[in-house]
Amino acid sequence: MSALSARVPLANSQERYLQLRINERRALEEYLAQLRAKFGGHIQHVILYGSRARLSGDQESDLDVLIVIDRDDQQLANEVADEAFGPSLQHGVVISPLVWSAEHFQAHRRFGLLIYRNIEKDGIELWSDKTKLPLSSIG
């Protein structure tokens, strides 16, 4: 069990995820599918955070997504972030990826930095390397 799922019960996360608009879920799921196909072995976590994860955003709010990759590689990070463009455009939402290496993620955890605490508190883990299975909700 990840540190995030230990703090936020899965049922609560899944319920919040299902309350996203259908185009938001479709954009996220398409993005996850592209990440899995192109970078699956390098992705450790994908976490929705921010106002949409808290269900407090409005129609203009972006989808803040943290992607944790297995190494500190700027080219890989850029490629992972760039994959958000197509699903964003196709589904009329803005996916705002934040790509961290696992080491960077652990440093934020270790020092209890504010962004990590907010992600831990409100984040919805869409994908963990433990399961490699994103949440699926499109009916």
Task: Pin down the residues of each PLM region.
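Short beta-strand->loop micro-motif that forms the acidic, two-metal-ion catalytic signature
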Residues: L63-I67
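Catalytic core of pol beta-like nucleotidyltransferases
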Residues: S2-H45, A53-Q59, I69-G139
